[in-house]
Amino acid sequence: MENVFDYEDIQLIPAKCIVDSRSECDTSVTLGGHTFKLPVVPANMQTIIDENIAAWLAENGYFYIMHRFEPEKRLAFVQDMKARGLISSISVGVKENDYEFIRELKAQELVPDYITIDIAHGHSNAVISMIQFIKEHVPESFVIAGNVGTPEAVRELERAGADATKVGIGPGKVCITKIKTGFGTGGWQLAALRWCAKAASKPIIADGGIRTHGDIAKSIRFGASMVMIGSLFAGHEESPGQTIEIDGKLYKEYFGSASEFQKGEKKNVEGKKMHVEHKGSLQDTLVEMEQDLQSSISYAGGNTLEAIRNVDYVIVKNSIFNGDRF
């Protein structure tokens, strides 16, 4: 690999502005035949999304992916979203009960709009088999497969039938894969995204390592169609985690999908738990993200997300905050 860098190492270079107001800039993105207000999706984690948040996001024009940690509820969830005329977007693993679930979907002629195959190391025979199984049983579903961190993985999952791939091995705030295993894209996630996107012929979803709204624009610049975000979406009024008070301040729980809090056991743990400050309403965060991304588009010299893909950039190792940590 040539240059290795991460989000805080990159600054995008402005181009001549062509809009009178940032409100003229369109942040929408199309994925799998549906158009969404933002190229952003809350992480499919138990402390980030639940049925209520999924329905609210769908009703308001945002993409979502429901988590896979209550498998017994998945069928009813798809039925409910269909009944309400909303997009259905669910996650599966690669275990026998996941295969059973896909068979059940076919038997009931239920076709989720999106199915995300979601395991920590997605470049695997198990994921390839599941992609092929889904495409055989519910071929109309848009299949997102991951997570991966190499061009070879992207090509192989696309060849197997994936409609999009999710890039990121352990760069998230509550993920400790890099510490526990020595592997992953933590610390060079943005370079890994660029590397993978160059090999991709289908959409890429960047997953993990996003710490600021500017990182969304950087992900778009380096090839992401959609950006999955955990920690920035944790801690909202609507978030599923428990609210607790520490020294007079309100916090919410946020834990990784491979943490012992998620698994209920200390076995193959690659995630941790943290408390994030209570952030108010999810809608306020989404509006702020949209406004910041509109500003990014205006700096990129265009009026759609496409403009961001064409800007120049510089690598400024670890210096863009100049001591200012938000």
Swiss-Prot record:
GO terms for cellular component: cytosol; GMP reductase complex. SMART domains: IMPDH. InterPro entries: Aldolase_TIM, GMP_reductase, GuaC_type_2, IMP_DH/GMP_Rdtase_CS, IMP_DH_GMPRt. NADP(+) binds at residues 204-227. Its EC number is 1.7.1.7. It catalyses: IMP + NH4(+) + NADP(+) = GMP + NADPH + 2 H(+). The active site is at 175 (thioimidate intermediate). CDD domains: IMPDH. GO terms for biological process: purine nucleotide metabolic process. Belongs to the IMPDH/GMPR family. GuaC type 2 subfamily. PANTHER family: GMP REDUCTASE. HAMAP family: GMP_reduct_type2 (MF_01511). This is GMP reductase. It comes from Bacillus velezensis (strain DSM 23117 / BGSC 10A6 / LMG 26770 / FZB42) (Bacillus amyloliquefaciens subsp. plantarum). The gene is guaC.
